[in-house]
Amino acid sequence: MDVKERFHFRGNINVDNLLEIYNQNELDWDSFEFRQQTFVCFADTKTLPIIYDETFQFEEKKVSDVFPIFESVISSIQEQLKFILNQDGEIVSFMLVNLPSKKQVMPHVDWLPFASKFDRFHIPVLTNDDCIFTVGDESKNLKVGELWEINNDKHIHSVYNGGDTDRVHIIMDWKVKTPTD
C-alpha cells in the first residue's frame, strides 16, 4: 500500500455465513481482555480472537477455542482474498472486534513490528451510518461486506461509533506468500 494512501477499497466479501454464525451462537465477548488491557486505545472494544498471537510473532497459527465454528468462513474469506488481491497468501490473524454504541477506538498508530510485515484489512459485519473510521485526515463510513485495506502502521487512525447499535468488524492480517515460504 502506498505510504500516502490511508484507505484502499479492495472489493466486497460475502459475510452472510459469518453473520449466521454470529446470530446462532452465544459468543463470549468478555473473557478475552488482553487487547483492551494492553492497549489503552482499545479499552472500549470487545474482542473475539479466532486466530491471534499475543506475542505478535505470527510464526505459527494460534487458534482459539471458537476457531472450529469459524474455520470454513475463514477459509472462504482467504480464497476470496486470493482472488481479489490476485496473490497467494494466508490470513495470519483474524478477530472479530465489537465497538459498542457511543464508544470509540482512540487515535493510534500500530507500531509493533508485525504491522509493517502484513497487510491489515477490515470487513464490517455489523455497522451503522454513524460509525466513522478515520485514518489520517480522511474519514469514512465503511459498509457491511466491504473489504478495506487500512494503512495502520503509517497513519494515526481511530473510530467513533456514534450510532445506537454495536459495530462488529473482522480485523485480519494478510501475509503474502513468497518463493521462500
Identify the meaning behind each predicted range:
Residues 2-8, 118-120, 169:
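Intrinsic-disorder/low-complexity, polar/charged segments enriched in Ser/Thr/Lys/Arg/Asp/Glu/Gln
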Residues 107-108, 131-133, 150-151, 155-163, ...:
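Short beta-strand His + acidic residue motifs that chelate non-heme Fe in jelly-roll/DSBH
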Residues 124-144:
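A short beta-strand-loop-beta hairpin characteristic of the jelly-roll/cupin
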Residues 111, 124-125, 161:
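Non-cytosolic beta-sheet module surface loops
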Residues 96-115:
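Conserved short histidine dyad/triad with adjacent acidic residue
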Residues 1-87:
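Non-heme Fe(II)/2-oxoglutarate
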Residues 119-124, 149, 164-180:
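A short hydrophobic beta-strand segment most commonly corresponding to one strand
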Residues 89-91, 100-102, 116-120, 126-128:
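Short connector loops at helix/strand junctions that flank enzyme active sites
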